[in-house]
UniProtKB/Swiss-Prot annotation, chain B:
One biological process term in Gene Ontology: lipid A biosynthetic process
Protein name (Swiss-Prot/TrEMBL): Acyl carrier protein
Places the protein is found: Cytoplasm
Record key words, sorted: Cytoplasm, Fatty acid biosynthesis, Fatty acid metabolism, Lipid biosynthesis, Lipid metabolism, Phosphopantetheine, Phosphoprotein
Pathway of action: Lipid metabolism; fatty acid biosynthesis
Limits of the Carrier domain: 2-77
Function comment: Carrier of the growing fatty acid chain in fatty acid biosynthesis.
Similarity comment: family membership: Belongs to the acyl carrier protein (ACP) family.
GO CC term, one of those recorded: membrane
Pfam families: PP-binding
Gene: acpP
Amino acid sequence: MSGTATNGRRVVVTGIGVVSPLAVGAELTWKRLIEGQSGIGRITHFDPSELPAQVAGQVPDGPTAEGGLTLSDWVPVKDQKKMDRFIHLGLAAAIQAVEDSGWTPEDEDDRCATGVMIGSGIGGLQTIYDGSLTVSSGKARRLSPFFIPSALINLISGHLSIRYGFKGPNHAVVTACATGVHAIGDASRLIQYGDADVMVAGGAEAAICSLGIAGFCSARALSTGSNDDPTKASRPWDKDRDGFIMGEGAGVVVLEELEHARRRGAKIYGEIGGYGMSGDAYHITAPAEGHNGAFRAMKAALRNSGGLTTADIDYVNAHGTSTMADDLELDAVERFFGDDAKRLAMSSTKSAIGHLLGAAGAVEAIFCLQAIRDGIVPPTLNLDNPARDSVIDRVAHVAQQRKIDVALSNSFGFGGTNASIILKRFKD
Amino acid sequence: MSDIADKVKKIVVEHLGVDESKVTPDASFIDDLGADSLDTVELVMAFEEAFSVEIPEDAAEKIATVKDAIDYIEKQKAA
């Protein structure tokens, strides 16, 4: 990005929070991910036996110390029923991120310089389902006064701001499965433009309910062939893949203007190195041949990276949903990287946690930061027989040790919306 | 205490997440028990459901304390 509007303001990540099918907690999720564990199992949130897709990545219940979800550790009991599950999961990740960052605004100026941008792809689907049953059974007057604020997507941002007194920009992104990347990218720009010094940004999703699974089944988007072998169901690029696996959870980062982070001695996970967007203008659910939209999003991310080239990028966390579109993304990545594709590692972590829809891009951006920090590329599980060959190392089955200074994460959503974000090692 | 009073108290404890000892007859839902305006709407709905009574909006607005709720419901049930 050029011009005076940004005043050269750099944006770094100083806090991370994850709620995933592998664990509640960014570090435990990461540990289990690089061990090759899978978070996919038979659906227990409801009885899925009437539906063709019966497996998903559900957040495990259990003690917080063991990586399970104990909701009362995050949301007071009396407030829980005022929020859909996607808000519960979003708050759990956001609270982790804020506490990890150590940022506590001390005065009104600080509070006004701290904003929130946490979105969701779908929002309170189970709440809407339950509410419509109440109305259709003739009890419209009994509909809870919390029905609307429970279902609204921007209410994670709302609740978080109330909890911590964050009075800066309060916003929420809704771009289906690209939500998480758009939230982090757009929030970074708010910091670059001086609208805030700190932004808490990310995405959350909890659509593993009968309406959500039935809807994606009808769109023929979900895997139906591995109901008896759930951990094998999500298999990006494999020739036997047959659809995506729904996951639930949330990913949230604390973004901070570099000098602000330095002044308070904050721990820095990495820097936002670039961000690009595009639209397909093609079809509501399918990308076009060659996935030109993905190509243009990656190109746009590089264009405003301050001089990075494809040779600098060591790792791509692919959108890679375990659908036919995987190979179209592969086409676009190969074309974009050209000769540099040979030295690239690319994996799809959806093989382990499923597709977290509006949370996916945020969780995957956090994985990129952890990969940079630890020098480890997470694996693509179940890639037994690639549907087609590629010069790109897709990190089948087991994690790899590799020096990673720069990583790129792709997310694409229904409607033909594409976003790419570059995360890089922080250097003075 | 009447059955109605017991049941009202139980609903208040459940919906507002407050300690039973705080739910005294004179306790105000908003001033003493931490409710906001949406909480009071939901409380009234819960009373309607539990006691099979209709509480019109103008009556609901006058129910500010635990005792107000008990009195209103007892009157409706006696009628």
